[in-house]
Amino acid sequence: MIQATYLLHMANIYNEGTVGRDKVPVIEGEHVAVMGCGNVAMDAARTAVRMGAASVTIVYRRTEADMPAIQAEYQAALQEGVKFLWQTSTTEFLGNEDGKVVGLRANTPEGVKEYAFDRICLAVGSRPASRIVSTTEGIETDDNGYVLVKERPFGMTSRKGVFAGGDVVHRPQTVVMAMKAAKSVAVGIAQYVDAVKLLSE
């Protein structure tokens, strides 16, 4: 069982030539299930296809109309051969005597069914860690718990001098995107510090 963000990260650094193919947690010929139906799930499913999976199936508890993924991502996944199990609510992951995942059991409109998979990738909805918000006054968040930040200086929260970036500000993405956000926030911090110095002179 793997996290979608981990799969995407390892695939990215494999494509960059930083690690070998054996570090990408999808083996050629495997039957892969991706849990969830957002943009990250679509990315993970398409990545698994490109890594040589025999089949990739997105398992989603709601209908096609309810999926949070944008249509462009969905259509791209279909074109690459990703399959979909709609209204399929997983109740149990199945394993063998060695502890290896061999499939899942789920409630479907036709009743309880079991599906065989070699690997399961988790791309379900997540919320950012809230400890920083609960222990620091004056930091505002949106309805989903993500920290609200300003464009100028980039990354500054509603509390003056406190900055945020990456997965605590938006949905989980790749490490590459987190690094990009960190660089942008660093520029915002530098601008803020320069402004404070200027005002104090």
Placement of each model-derived feature along the sequence:
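A conserved FAD-binding loop/helix module that cradles the flavin
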Residues: 37, 44, 165-199
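FAD-site-proximal beta/loop scaffold in flavoenzymes
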Residues: 2-29, 119-172
